[in-house]
Structures are given as C-alpha cells and as structure tokens.
Amino acid sequence: LKAVDQSREEFVSNVSHELKTPITSIRVLADSLMSMDDVPVELYREFMTDISDEIDRENQIIEDLLMLVKMDKTAEDQMNIEQVNINGELELILKRLRPIAKRGNVELILESIREVTADVDKVKISLAITNLVENAIKYNRDSGMVRVTLDADHKYFYIKVADTGIGIPEDALEHIFERFFRVDKARSREVGGTGLGLAIAKNVIQMHHGIIDVESTVGEGTTFSVRIPLNYVPRQEAKP
C-alpha cells in the first residue's frame, strides 16, 4: 500500500510538472512581448509561433493523460474486440504518417511477410502502433529509415518497428516505458514528445495479452518488437 501511495504521489508530481512547463514558457514569452514598446514583426511572429507550439504541447499532454486514465479504468469486457486485417491497418497507419516522415526526410517501409487477421481492439492497436512508428520518425536522422515488419505463426502475430535513428543508451532501456520518461529531454521538447507515447503503447499491448521488447544501439537505431495472440481470450476464460 505504501508503494502504491508513493507511486501515485510521483505520478501526480510528474503530471503537475509536465503541465506547468508549457504554461511557464507561454508566460515568459507573453511577458517579453508585453514589455516591448515596438516589437519587430519578425520577432512577434517568432514569439507567437513559440506560444502556439507550447499550446499544442500542452494539449497533447492532456490528451495523452486522458487516454492513460481511460485505459487504466478499462475492464477487459469493455474491449471492442473484432477480427481485423492487420496488414490493412498497418498500411493505413503508414499512410497517415507519411507526411510527417516526409518533413523529416525519413523513408517509411512496410514489409508484410504474410496476411494476418487477428482478434484485436482496432482503435487501441492502431494507437499503439502509431505511437511506435511516430517515435521512430521523430527520433530518426535526416535521410533515415523506418521499417515496419509484420509476420505471424499459428498462435501469434509479430510486428517490428526498426529505425536508423539516434538510439537509446543501455541504462535508459529499462525506463523507456515509464510514464513521462524521456531519454533526451531537449530533443523530446523539440519534436513535441510528451513521454507518454510508449507507456500508452505498452498498456494497449498488455491489454491484448501481448508483450513488447526493445533493442537499441546508440547512433545506429532502435527496434521495438511486439507479439500479440491471434485469438483474444479474456483472462477469466484463459486456462491457468
């Protein structure tokens, strides 16, 4: 019980800090503008762009937090399980993310080794994989690549998201699925990272009784490996 209370206090403290940071930045920028009698148009536009970015960041943090809270309260009987063509879903995800990849000069590749149909919550699975691919794009390098691979056997389907990005230090790997953890806070701020995307992805995958692993080499890239059962069986019905 003490550990739970401590964990809750740490989470609330982190939430408070993360929500205050963009507001503090907006306040500083606004105060700076108001203290100037004659603001050059270019400087005004620059400050307003920064304020807009901070508002977007605050909004993203709130949306991610609401999603996590909703998932924490979601029981298995509230999962909208249906048969989904995973190949088609991955194609849609990459199609939506191509404009972001193009801006970062990152190539997106989908390799479907076989056709896969599985029992999943379509919306939640799409969210999890989108977070993984979007991270791979954001933390990549110029002229980099993200390869998404889909395979399956008789029991599970497997998704790998591999990038040629900046990589993750070994001592950070065990923490990357923690809420609000960011390897490079400066880079996360630059690309709009909230430190919640991977926590959401892991939560979704675990709700499907799956697992997610990560391998990374600094300066070479990162690979996230996901394994999810083809047939969803509620835990109360699963055999011990």
Locations of the language-model features?
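Short conserved segment of the HATPase_c
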Residues: 168-182
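Short helix-loop "hinge" at the ATP-lid/N-box region of the Bergerat-fold HATPase_c
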Residues: 136-137
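Conserved micro-motifs of the catalytic ATP-binding
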Residues: 73-79, 117-120
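Conserved catalytic submotifs in the C-terminal HATPase_c
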Residues: 80-83, 102, 107-117
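Short alpha-helical segment of the dimerization/phosphotransfer core of two-component systems
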Residues: 53-61
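Conserved glycine-rich
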Residues: 209-210
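Short beta-strand/loop element within the Bergerat-fold HATPase_c
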Residues: 143-155
